[in-house]
Amino acid sequence: MIRIGDGRKSDSWAEINVVVDIFRSTTTIPMILFRGAKYILPFRDVRKAIEFKRRNPGTILVGEKYGIKPPYFDYDNSPAEIAEADLSGKVVAFTSTNGTYVLSRIRSGRIIFSSYVNLSATVAMIRSQRDVLILPSNRPIGKAPEDILFANLLKLMAEGHEVDVSEYTRKTEEINRNIIAGVGERDLEFCLRVDHTNIVPEYIDGRIVQSPDSVALTDA
């Protein structure tokens, strides 16, 4: 069974929990791994991420807080920016307003991250699972319609329904135009890019890595 919850309010979990934050965390996270990062360490607190880099100088800092790149960070929470970065073999410390908050709330089950950039790979991974919870990250002040829209798309596709993905990306683009200080054009283009990668990130033992299941999909 595939259910849709609320990343900020749900208090029960599934065997597989799918975090969705279209603008921009769950688009950026697959791109970090796609660009060669060894693994990602998620932080809710910017200061703790900076302190980690101070103790581990080779760390790359990526993220934002309330839409703004923090001081001392190497990259914004920007899939377009990350797409041009060489992260080969690097450890990335990552923080964001919504995605890492939702991650911190989940208490059981596997945790994976999905967006348009790894849509088909996510569908392939969850469609045969018996207990899946899709968690739109939403926002501190309320719902995020782009996350809810994608969650419904992911559910329909995983259940075997035929859908017009372009209609969902079109609606998502419209949503962005109505958001105050919405995503910039370069990031928007990346956030709407379908199946850019087969990588499905998974949170395992405190690190975000390429899911072993998505490795199998890539090799197939």
Swiss-Prot record:
Designated name of the protein: Probable 2-phosphosulfolactate phosphatase
Keyword Magnesium included in the entry's annotation: yes
NCBIfam families for this protein: PRK00886.1-6
Gene label: comB
The family this protein is said to belong to: Belongs to the ComB family.
Keyword list, A-Z: Hydrolase, Magnesium
Catalytic activity annotation: (2R)-O-phospho-3-sulfolactate + H2O = (2R)-3-sulfolactate + phosphate
Organism: Thermoplasma acidophilum (strain ATCC 25905 / DSM 1728 / JCM 9062 / NBRC 15155 / AMRC-C165)
EC id: 3.1.3.71
UniProt cofactor(s): Mg(2+)
InterPro entries in the cross-refs: ComB-like, ComB-like_sf
Chain coiled-coil ranges: none
